[in-house]
């Protein structure tokens, strides 16, 4: 029987992320980005009954750059994804990887008590969850 310590999303997630207002222009969002390694922005809720959104850098490439649209004339809400799939920080990384794979997404917010606490991607799951465990063995 395999008795490995269960690695949780909270153990590998990136707690640093960029959060933007959906009414911002894409240009303003890109200019404000402090964590480009995440390749995404969390879009704030507008009110209590709203949901978080997600804007990937690849969305900007496809829906602004490739379509030859002006980034200073496109608002984040026009091209963001909403509603989004998110995970709990207590989730086992194996299930998180399966969820990302099943829905063909590469990264997702980590939400606890209705607040974003981090971002997790396949990179964090593999490098932080698998590789680091092998190094500690």
What positions do the PLM features span?
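Tandem CBS (Cystathionine beta-synthase) repeat/Bateman regulatory domains
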Residues: 1-137
């Amino acid at each position: 029987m395999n008795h490995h310590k269960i690695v949780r999303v909270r153990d590998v997630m990136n707690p640093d992320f960029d959060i933007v207002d959906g009414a911002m222009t894409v240009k303003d969002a890109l200019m404000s980005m402090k964590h480009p390694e995440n390749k995404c922005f969390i879009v704030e809720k507008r009110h209590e009954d709203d949901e978080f959104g997600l804007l990937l850098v690849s969305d900007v490439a496809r829906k602004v750059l490739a379509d030859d649209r002006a980034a200073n004339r496109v608002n984040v809400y026009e091209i963001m994804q909403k509603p989004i799939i998110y995970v709990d920080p207590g989730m086992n990384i194996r299930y998180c990887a399966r969820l990302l794979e099943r829905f063909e997404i590469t990264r997702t917010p980590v939400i606890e008590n209705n607040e974003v606490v981090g971002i997790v991607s396949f990179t964090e799951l593999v490098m932080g969850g698998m590789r680091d465990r092998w190094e500690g063995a």
